[in-house]
Amino acid sequence: MGLLLVIVLVTLVFKATGTAGRSFGRLQDELQLQEARRHILAQLEKTVCYDAQSVRLQDDGKISCRMLEGCKQVTVYSDKQGIYQRTRTNKGTGVNPVSLEEVGVFGWQVRRCSPQMLCVSFDLYRNGRSMRVMQYFICYSARITDDA
């Protein structure tokens, strides 16, 4: 009888910790998606809204910015389930990730809403969980043009 009680208690404990573990995993995934969203939007806001002198939306979804800081060109684009920023200066070119490595980015779209307003939308994915992101940016120092 005592052995049966121990087996039942151990089974209940394992089920409870398994459920708690899965819930904790889902919570971690949700927090990671929120952090990725915040990080991407903050980087885009800094680049497009504050530091750009001109913004050009390319047909392939790239955002090309000429920066207030002289002789600097920044292009933001989506590639291989991530968002990247290519920076060109007189001294050379470099590429840095804007998105977090642990979170996939899909469905990247950009469109001009007005001469100074830009809409960016994309989906974030992590371990089967997803989040749709859509944000409007007002370019304070730049005018937005489209490829025609």
Predicted regions and their residues:
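Short, low-complexity, Pro/Ser/Thr/Gly-rich segments in the mature regions of secreted, periplasmic
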Residues: M134-A148
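Type IV pilin-like appendage domain
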Residues: S54-C119, R129-R132, D147-A148
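Alpha-helix exit/C-cap motif
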Residues: H39-D60
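Broad hydrophobic/π-residue packing in well-ordered secondary structure
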Residues: T17, F24, Q43-K46, V74-Q81
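Short, cationic motifs built from Arg/Lys/His that form the positively charged side of catalytic pockets
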Residues: C49, G82-R86, S141
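Aliphatic-rich helix starts adjacent to a transmembrane/signal segment
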Residues: M1-A42
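Beta-strand-rich extracellular modules
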Residues: D123-N127
